[in-house]
């Protein structure tokens, strides 16, 4: 009887985790990592799940940083299902699942902060024009509005990256960029994840007070 009870508890814990934002985020990140491994070869390097101090008192969390001869691509993944509505200038986009709608931050605005942090970190190595923002939703979502040119579903983003065909970063500079970013990354742990979440909550609270 006790064994059966423990088994049920384990199943419930696993099912809860599978539905959690953390698991969904990890699956979205894994999707991008697989695409890079299969399609872009050895000339590019990928940094995943990077928590980096910003220029204030908080942190910013970047899903992927792809360092290639053709530029540095900052990738924000969204493991969302359902219909997606949004445009470049809207502060919030909408996810619709059946009759329910959910608002979420415009990922382009979210990734803009990531871009600015990396721009500062790499200011003496790389010109800002070689930093590129990419937003990747999973294939389980469906866009219901026309999306900006750097927002994709599934592996379609690979073709966008490949459209940059002029080599602008030498192999030596790629290594410098990789090393510089790695120096800034906070060691991944539950503590850094918690600190980032608390910072986002505090920021959201402050914004509400300002409004």
Stretches found by the model and what they are:
Residues 1-60, 67-72, 81-83, 92, ...:
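Surface-exposed interaction regions that form or flank ligand-binding interfaces
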């Amino acid at each position: 009887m006790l064994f059966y009870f423990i088994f049920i508890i384990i199943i419930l814990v696993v099912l809860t985790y599978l539905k959690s934002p953390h698991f969904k985020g990890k699956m979205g990140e894994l999707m991008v990592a697989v695409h890079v491994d299969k399609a872009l070869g050895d000339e590019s390097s990928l940094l995943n799940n990077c928590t980096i101090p910003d220029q204030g008192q908080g942190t910013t969390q970047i899903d992927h940083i792809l360092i290639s001869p053709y530029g540095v691509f900052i990738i924000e993944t969204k493991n969302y299902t359902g219909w997606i509505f949004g445009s470049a200038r809207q502060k919030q986009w909408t996810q619709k699942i059946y009759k329910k709608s959910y608002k979420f931050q415009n990922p382009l605005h979210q990734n803009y902060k990531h871009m600015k942090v990396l721009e500062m970190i790499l200011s003496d190595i790389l010109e800002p024009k070689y930093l590129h923002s990419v937003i990747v939703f999973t294939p389980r979502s469906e866009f219901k509005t026309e999306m900006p040119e750097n927002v994709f579903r599934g592996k379609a983003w690979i073709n966008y990256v490949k459209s940059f065909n002029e080599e602008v970063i030498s192999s030596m500079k790629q290594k410098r960029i990789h090393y510089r970013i790695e120096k800034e990354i906070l060691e991944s742990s539950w503590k850094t994840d918690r600190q980032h979440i608390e910072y986002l909550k505090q920021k959201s609270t402050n914004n509400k007070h300002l409004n």
